[in-house]
Amino acid sequence: MEDFVRQCFNPMIVELAEKTMKEYGEDLKIETNKFAAICTHLEVCFMYSDFHFINEQGESIIVELGDPNALLKHRFEIIEGRDRTVAWTVVNSICNTTGAEKPKFLPDLYDYKENRFIEIGVTRREVHIYYLEKANKTKSEKTHIHIFSFTGEEMATKADYTLDEESRARIKTRLFTIRQEMASRGLWDSFRQSERGEETIEERFEITGTMRKLADQSLPPNFSSLENFRAYVDGFEPNGYIEGKLSQMSKEVNARIEPFLKTTPRPLRLPNGPPCSQRSKFLLMDALKLSIEDPSHEGEGIPLYDAIKCMRTFFGWKEPNVVKPHEKGINPNYLLSWKQVLAELQDIENEEKIPKTKNMKKTSQLKWALGENMAPEKVDFDDCKDVGDLKQYDSDEPELRSLASWIQNEFNKACELTDSSWIELDEIGEDVAPIEHIASMRRNYFTSEVSHCRATEYIMKGVYINTALLNASCAAMDDFQLIPMISKCRTKEGRRKTNLYGFIIKGRSHLRNDTDVVNFVSMEFSLTDPRLEPHKWEKYCVLEIGDMLLRSTIGRVSRPMFLYVRTNGTSKIKMKWGMEMRRCLLQSLQQIESMIEAESSVKEKDMTKEFFENKSETWPIGESPKGVEEGSIGKVCRTLLAKSVFNSLYASPQLEGFSAESRKLLLIVQALRDNLEPGTFDLGGLYEAVEECLINDPWVLLNASWFNSFLTHALR
């Protein structure tokens, strides 16, 4: 930045800025952004004054350089850039000769035509915010304020801009040029973020008129005026005072502020009980795909055509049988449902022309699986209000479940790389501004780190399934439509690939409200034997449906192929959010960006390239019982993405509550680590609020276990 300033600004301006910084005891080698800001401000003040004169008639005129009348009186007196004592001498002299009111702070210019002092502001923030800060600082009705920004905006007292449009345009153009020059060298972001507000911002901002009346009316009880209240707040000592006030409120309220020490927090209590079970809407690490490469068949892109083509790639089908029954379900119905799907797909293949959609016959097994006619009949309240024992359904408390190891395995798998790419680089036009160039560069680096990630596959799978299900729910409300579960990707060699995970059959879907439920049966292929972790598959009936030949180090081996079948349900609002799962990419990109920004502001240059290309550097990823886990920047990207994706896949009220309440505890612990000596009252109540969310949800239980690891290592 220092080199840039010396190249970009006139040596006289640079010299003045150096003197100013020396006067205030600031080191320009360290405060390089401050150095650039002072130079910019000086240049704007000089440009403001340039070419403006007053003729013998007292009129303001503009005279370009080289004009013979250059002996005219300058319209503006420049105060900025002078030695402090000289500057105050000039101000005093002006006040004595013109009768102007003496300002509290040194202004930048004096305008002999309008007879007023001018405060010039150059801001990297919003002009109106900076204007208010200046107004609050000067406190003088007489000092005129004129603010310029690097984006070409300006603001002045009473919209009186003093100069003609051309002179102001010259200043704006120069500021825009400085911004572009900085951006092209990767200096702009750091410079933009380094601006601090006016030092005297804490001084009182006078409130008058209506606002004053409103302020006086909205005071808490027992305060007669705003000044009274301000004095009370300024002299407020929290400890002891809060306790005293609370004890006056009620005999039941008793809050002592306890110091929060390293020994204060205890681990969260995770529930005991049977292990938690899988509750995602589709299989994750256990899913198996039937795939076709370079699809070019007739009707390619029509889901049903693609599904049939994928089904034809497998030849190991066999008579299906139940290997892991669903405890509460009628398992033969699940078996019959799969047989029905196979039979109806065979019927389609025998037809001359394959239809675009397939509605299943409403057999007894599908009616049972989809809960047809199972909903209790709705009766008008007026017809039954005389019934004596009218009551709401008894609903059982949810059964407590313990954390199982499978959910950590699922998360680890989601962070891994697959051998296919699941998203394309956006086709976006040429970058116009330097900031767009940096944004594109970051997006491209990030995309290359996550495009092959399994979490990205889950995003695309989720988007496809939810879109297809919502479309079918609206287009075929009464039908049991067969919906293939499909995704598309590219192989390492860049060849297109279409994958089939299984099928969904949707039930009746007259969805009037956002929360109205549509039932569906999912049937998904897998090579995972459910008998290895039966607790994970509590909600599923699992069939063995074939044998698959797999290549291995010892040649080809045959593995049984399973079908995971379950009844499930979703709503319009859940499907809407499922369709928008791509937002997870954006959320994790923004988290990475804030890491880059933090690094860039320390180094005072854009660190995007170094951030992604320095393969030797490791970053903290998360906490585990072993301590802080570290990994490459790519691993960080994929871990953040997987967390965001799991928040979407396992969204629930338990997760909402846990995230909100545990965050409070996290902030207290963080304050302790930062030596801020936090105090708490009713810490037990906070623990209760967190722990009431730990019931049976696998993702929430895993997050709670991570939280405990964090507590252990953070407070060592």
Curated annotation (Swiss-Prot):
Write out the annotated subcellular location. Host cytoplasm; Host nucleus
Sequence intervals crossing the membrane: none
Full protein name: Polymerase acidic protein
As for PTM, the annotation reads: Phosphorylated on serines and threonines by host kinases, including human casein kinase II.
| Chain positions of motif Nuclear localization signal 1 (NLS1) | 124-139
> Quick one: which residues bind Mn(2+) 2?
E80, D108
Q: Name one GO biological process term.
A: symbiont-mediated suppression of host gene expression
Q: Which family does it belong to?
A: Belongs to the influenza viruses PA family.
Keyword annotations for this protein? Cap snatching, Endonuclease, Eukaryotic host gene expression shutoff by virus, Eukaryotic host transcription shutoff by virus, Host cytoplasm, Host gene expression shutoff by virus, Host nucleus, Host-virus interaction, Hydrolase, Inhibition of host RNA polymerase II by virus, Manganese, Metal-binding, Nuclease, Phosphoprotein
Function comment? Plays an essential role in viral RNA transcription and replication by forming the heterotrimeric polymerase complex together with PB1 and PB2 subunits. The complex transcribes viral mRNAs by using a unique mechanism called cap-snatching. It consists in the hijacking and cleavage of host capped pre-mRNAs. These short capped RNAs are then used as primers for viral mRNAs. The PB2 subunit is responsible for the binding of the 5' cap of cellular pre-mRNAs which are subsequently cleaved after 10-13 nucleotides by the PA subunit that carries the endonuclease activity.
Q: Which residues bind Mn(2+) 1?
A: H41, D108, E119, I120
How is the cofactor bound here?
Binds 2 manganese ions per subunit.
Q: What is its EC number?
A: 3.1.-.-
Q: Quote the cellular component terms of the Gene Ontology held in the record.
A: host cell cytoplasm; host cell nucleus
* A Gene Ontology molecular function term of the record: endonuclease activity
The answer to whether UniProt assigns keyword Metal-binding to this entry is yes
Q: Which cofactor does it need?
A: Mn(2+)
The listed location of motif Nuclear localization signal 2 (NLS2) is 184-247
Does the UniProt entry include the keyword Hydrolase? Answer: yes
- Alphabetical list of Gene3D superfamilies matching this protein: Influenza RNA-dependent RNA polymerase subunit PA, endonuclease domain
* The protein's assembly and partners: Influenza RNA polymerase is composed of three subunits: PB1, PB2 and PA. Interacts (via C-terminus) with PB1 (via N-terminus).
Class of the enzyme per the UniProt entry, highest EC level? hydrolase
